[in-house]
């Protein structure tokens, strides 16, 4: 009788343990984000100056302990990067390139900068989590953080100025469906329109004032020059 009671207790414990362990894992690793369309996740529009805060708000909810960030959330952040990049090429560059130089083009450029801030915030958050989970992404994290800080500064430099948002048909649950090929010719044309717009409106600060990001100062050494070259090459890449 005593043996039967002990056996029953052991069976009960064995049955409960997997359930408790499973519940514990779910509570620690449950995904934070759900699928979003580009138009749902975008922070572009309104006025420039708060892109940093807006991006962090859109992407809030990850655990403070980044080792516990769920794989599905890393996939989501990567997908945000992808669809924002696609919108940058397929929507913003295309529209800016087709716009007559002037304030309208600059308003589009400000929205493009806001989009870059969201894209790069998602990228940096994902890399920070990957680093916390043991992946060697230090160099990439430093590179993307530098680009993020630059675009945040560009956005803040245009604080209070109108930003014209564009819609784009893409979703984080299937970013490949909206894939847009990189187009250097289109990107250059859009950049030329922004340059001409700055001159036409009398805006100061050159390309950097509109967030084009072209470096005008000579790099201090070859390593810095290489980083600058990489930034120029991947500005419109994932």
Enumerate the language-model features and the residues they cover.
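Composition-driven recognition of long, low-complexity, acid-poor segments enriched in small hydrophobic
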Residues: 23-26, 220-224
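Mature extracellular/secreted ectodomains of secretory-pathway proteins
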Residues: 48-221
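Residue-level signal for the start and early helices of compact helical domains
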Residues: 1, 29-34, 111, 139, ...
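Intrinsic structural disorder
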Residues: 5-16, 29, 79, 83-87, ...
């Amino acid at each position: 009788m005593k043996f039967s009671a002990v056996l029953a207790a052991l069976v009960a414990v064995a049955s409960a343990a997997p359930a408790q362990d499973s519940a514990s894992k779910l509570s620690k690793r449950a995904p934070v984000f759900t699928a979003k369309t580009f138009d749902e996740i975008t922070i572009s529009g309104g006025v420039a100056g708060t892109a940093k805060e807006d991006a962090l708000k859109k992407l809030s909810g990850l655990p403070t302990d980044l080792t516990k960030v769920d794989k599905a959330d890393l996939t989501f952040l990567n997908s945000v990067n992808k669809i924002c990049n696609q919108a940058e090429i397929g929507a913003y560059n295309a529209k800016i390139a087709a716009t007559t130089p002037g304030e309208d083009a600059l308003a589009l450029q400000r929205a493009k900068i806001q989009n870059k801030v969201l894209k790069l915030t998602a990228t940096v958050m994902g890399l920070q989590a990957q680093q916390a989970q043991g992946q060697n992404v230090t160099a990439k994290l430093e590179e993307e953080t530098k680009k993020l800080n630059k675009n945040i500064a560009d956005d803040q430099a245009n604080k209070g100025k109108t930003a014209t948002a564009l819609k784009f048909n893409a979703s984080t649950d299937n970013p490949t469906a909206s894939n847009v090929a990189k187009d250097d010719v289109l990107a250059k044309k859009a950049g030329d329109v922004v340059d001409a717009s700055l001159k036409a409106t009398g805006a100061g600060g050159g390309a950097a004032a509109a967030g084009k990001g072209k470096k005008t100062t000579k790099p201090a050494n070859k390593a810095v020059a290489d980083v600058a070259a990489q930034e120029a090459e991947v500005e419109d890449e994932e």
